[in-house]
Amino acid sequence: MEEDDVARMLYTRDELVLVLDLYFRRGSNLHVTSPEVIELSQTLRRMDVLPVDELPMPDSFRSVNSVQQKIKGFQNADPDVSGGLYREGKLTRDILLEFREERERLHSLAARIRSRFSTA
């Protein structure tokens, strides 16, 4: 598996819920050094979608760059943003449309997901 393959591994529904929650709370102008992006990257890595230590380039998996790119992906798919609803995967678009008008439900679901992978 090449580094690009690791970076492009499809996000799961739970992972996308967490990213969308951050996008709705903070927008798309988050930098890779933003504490929220760093924390989300760490949470996604703890979710153990794949055994990270067995990947050829483990630092690339759900890295801060990957998280920032996925946040931008939600912006690209957002019909409320000029030029939205293009270039993103079906699951990304579906989750955005599902929760667009139900942000409280999204925040609640995201909190439940985060609590399962909390370090505290």
Predicted regions and their residues:
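Intrinsically disordered, charged low-complexity linkers and terminal tails
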Residues: 1-120
